[in-house]
Amino acid sequence: MDPYKHRPSSGSNSTFWTTNSGAPVWNNNSALTVGERGPILLEDYHLIEKLAQFDRERIPERVVHARGASAKGFFEVTHDISHLTCADFLRAPGVQTPVIVRFSTVVHERGSPETLRDPRGFAVKFYTREGNFDLVGNNMPVFFIRDGMKFPDMVHAFKPSPKTNMQENWRIVDFFSHHPESLHMFSFLFDDVGIPLNYRHMEGFGVNTYTLINKDGKPHLVKFHWKPTCGVKCLLDDEAVTVGGTCHSHATKDLTDSIAAGNYPEWKLYIQTIDPDHEDRFDFDPLDVTKTWPEDIIPLQPVGRMVLNKNIDNFFAENEQLAFCPAIIVPGIHYSDDKLLQTRIFSYADTQRHRLGPNYLMLPVNAPKCAYHNNHHDGSMNFMHRDEEVNYFPSRFDAARHAEKVPIPPRVLTGCREKCVIDKENNFQQAGERYRSFDPARQDRFLQRWVDALSDPRITHELRGIWISYWSQCDASLGQKLASRLNLKPNM
């Protein structure tokens, strides 16, 4: 065995117990003491090592998306979009790429029930020949805020109160009363889709706007959509109470059991694209993450399919240590000027460095499957074997060179440095259109959830009035019904 290239693996376990350094352990049942009943000796290194390792088994949980489940599989291109992108893994129909996917709830802690009303994370890591691509999205196509400056405040509002450690509706209602752009997202969250039946029966969305670039350098703005082949199914409120009371890990269990039984979940990938030269033609800003792109004027285009056919081998190694970041892209896919995406580019990598350390991309689940090379050396928990003498660039003693230049969006940007909101806010139209698309029973369930949320005794008359005004601007009848059930007069 080459000691410099050996990597610890359960596949090379010895037949007897050892310490972490490989020394044999002849007794893993009793501590070393002075006599049968005497005190424990500090020299019992195996005991100290065992306790110290146990004390450090847990790492900081994710500040959001803490509760999650992962599975592995492949993505296969089914339709040619090479005219839109030069991304290698999308180069032709039939091309397959290994993936790992993590589904999650967003707000609540690691051990919370999977039946709570909450957005669901839908993150996909593609292990391509040109490096990894992380498509980090949710099961809802829009978001609560359009500017990442408000993200920490938003999460604080959703998280338990720093005083009571309980999630409290009045805090959420208060914060979002200052952000009417959130109404479109709430038209999803307070709808039936706010509690998916399980992970197999929910959609996924890239949420943010990205950019596709073809080999000629032509860019197109793009939105990504995952559609489950088994359909979208949800839990109503009373069903969620029953299911959650029976098994608080029902979605994880369903995913694991389905794959183990050979009933592999599958999603179709679709995209919507907009020529950047045409982005001013709409009554909304295509870079506004609180808006969807209407499918009747920007149709879905099929791209491929994703099949999850293998359960993870170890929850900690392939779920807790699994790390996503929207900044991780490949040639042919680029960012856009979406304000929330621009913020996520920094924040995700930063939180992974906090959670897992500066070398988190060396962990097997996060490392690319292709060859890679740079001078990002050393740091805490660096376990890459290196024997180079040159750790700088350029050098006449190292043949490493720059890669071929890849196309990036050829935009010329001008403007003053300023902090401002976008021109086309249009906060109410799409939320109202979505509400009117519900059948009467679904509308009533949506209405009742808002009545319950606004009935919190800490919510003031002023706050209720603001929300009635907001929903009235989305749909007059919805505002009237909400006011009636709350015994208030609608105020436009």
UniProtKB/Swiss-Prot annotation:
Covalent cross-link (3-(S-cysteinyl)-tyrosine (Cys-Tyr)), residues: C325-Y348
Cofactor: heme
Source domain of life: Eukaryota
Residues the entry annotates as binding heme: R62, R102, F151, R344, Y348, R355
Pfam families assigned to the protein according to its UniProt record, in alphabetical order: Catalase, Catalase-rel
pH-dependence annotation: Optimum pH is 7.5.
PROSITE patterns listed in its UniProt record: CATALASE_1, CATALASE_2, CATALASE_3
Temperature-dependence annotation: Optimum temperature is 25 degrees Celsius.
SUPFAM superfamilies from the UniProt entry: Heme-dependent catalase-like
Residues spanned by motif Peroxisome targeting signal: 484-492
Entry's Gene Ontology cellular component terms: cytoplasm; glyoxysome; peroxisome; plasma membrane
Control of this protein's activity: Strongly inhibited by beta-mercaptoethanol, sodium azide and potassium cyanide. Slightly repressed by 3-amino-1,2,4-triazole (3-AT). Activity is repressed proportionally to increased concentration of NaCl, KCl, LiCl and MgCl(2).
Keywords: Cell membrane, Glyoxysome, Heme, Hydrogen peroxide, Iron, Membrane, Metal-binding, Oxidoreductase, Peroxidase, Peroxisome, Phosphoprotein, Stress response, Thioether bond
Reaction(s) this enzyme catalyzes, per UniProt: 2 H2O2 = O2 + 2 H2O
InterPro entries reported for this sequence: Catalase, Catalase_AS, Catalase_clade1/3, Catalase_core, Catalase_haem_BS, Catalase_immune_responsive, Catalase_sf
Chain intervals with Polar residues compositional bias: 9-20
Induction remark: Abundance in roots follows a diurnal oscillating expression pattern peaking during the night period. Induced by water stress and abscisic acid (ABA) in a concentration-dependent manner. Activated by salicylic acid (SA). Repressed by ABA biosynthesis inhibitors nordihydroguaiaretic acid and tungstate under water stress. Induced by high salinity (NaCl) and hydrogen peroxide (H(2)O(2)) treatments. Triggered by zinc oxide nanoparticles (ZnO NPs); this induction is reversed by sodium nitroprusside (SNP, a NO donor). Repressed by cadmium (Cd). Inhibited by heat stress (HS) (e.g.
Protein role: Occurs in almost all aerobically respiring organisms and serves to protect cells from the toxic effects of hydrogen peroxide. May prevent the excessive accumulation of H(2)O(2) during water stress in response to the accumulation of abscisic acid (ABA). Involved in the modulation of ROS levels related to root growth regulation. Required for pollen viability and floret fertility upon heat stress (HS) by detoxifying reactive oxygen species (ROS) and malondialdehyde (MDA) accumulation in developing anthers exposed to HS.
Family under the similarity heading: Belongs to the catalase family.
Identification of the protein by name: Catalase isozyme B
Organism: Oryza sativa subsp. japonica
Gene symbol of the encoding locus: CATB
